[in-house]
Amino acid sequence: MSHRRPASGTDGLGMSGVDRLVGEGARTVGAGAVWAVGDAGGTLGGGSHGLLGQGPYARLRPGPDTLHDLASLTKIVALWPCAGVLWQSGRLPPDEPLGRWWPPAAGHPAGEVTVRQLLAHTAGMLPYTRFEQLYGRDLAAIRAGVLAAPLHRPPGTAVEYTDRAAVLLTYLVEDLAGAPLDELAARWVWEPLGMADTRYGPLGTVLAARTAPTEYDERTGAHLRGVVHDPSARLLGGVSGNAGAFSTARDLARFLTALLAPPPGLPWGGAWIDESLREQTGGLVPARGLSWLCAPGTDPAEGTFVHYGFTGTGFWISRRLGRWALLLTNKVHYDRGVAQLTELRNAFRQAVFG
């Protein structure tokens, strides 16, 4: 990635300091890392460190064109903007319980929750998936199970992050739009922004060859590479709102730039971004926007938002500062420990946003 111009206000570090921070952090975490920082004009700077993986992957280094399993960043890159298209066109009422206007939810516990609560993770849904264990492998049975599952707590009483909210919202978005989420995301998000490498898996041989591997899979006897790591998304065929998308730092830079400077005619720009990037949880903690999390270590009033992915991915946005940042690692390839990665993420956020 080219350093287009120096960024101001990076806590005195500058781009070379941010690069050193990520390099040292990647060695401590023990994973490859790709980072970038930008503004409404595009990428300001970036870099990459470490190796793509162990064994046969130890000869490979990550870069801005390395595909990463985005894990829960899929919620932002695919599901959230598609929900925004429907919201801005008046087809997705944010505050009416689903059961009043979406027939599949009527008479079920899921009918008690609202779209806003699903996006803010205040819907009170079960905090785990366990789809195969609870419902088997049939997709219709899983959908029925998600709709009929009892709520974990009353809607609107607590913030509790759960993939079930994204899965339920996927069903709703697909029903309203009349197409699967991968087609909607490509049509409304990735193609308009020129995100040519972003897609759902499983990836073909050529793309898989430049994809960061995730965990070793006992069933196949190999590391997952180009196949979604998240077991729920894999069970759902690889396409879900909670996980399943793959992308590169180069493409994510285009996406984050568009949040600060939406292109004319973007069907989820403007009002949807305004609505989403403000606190939506009414003083409950942790504070969240719509899909986005208020960045840990910051005051929600500062308006710095983040989303993380289980595989080791993450990105941040601050409209107040006019800046975005991304940090992609393949941490889960090595182990599931999060303490050192959390330290790196927090230090990176502080360096870029203060």
Language-model regions, residue ranges each:
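Active-site SXXK
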Residues: G41, D69-D95, L169-E174, L252-F255, ...
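Generic C-terminus detector
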Residues: V332-G354
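Catalytic tyrosine of NAD(P)H-dependent dehydrogenase/reductases that use a Tyr as the general acid/base
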Residues: H68-A71, V159-Y161
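Short, surface-exposed beta-strand/loop micro-motifs that present aromatic residues
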Residues: T311-R320, W324
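Short, glycine/proline-biased beta-turn/loop segments that scaffold the active-site neighborhood
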Residues: P93-H108
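Short, surface-exposed loop or secondary-structure junction motifs
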Residues: G42, G46-G53, H108-G303
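Structural recognition of the beta-strand scaffold that forms the well-ordered cores
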Residues: Q117-L119, W324-L327
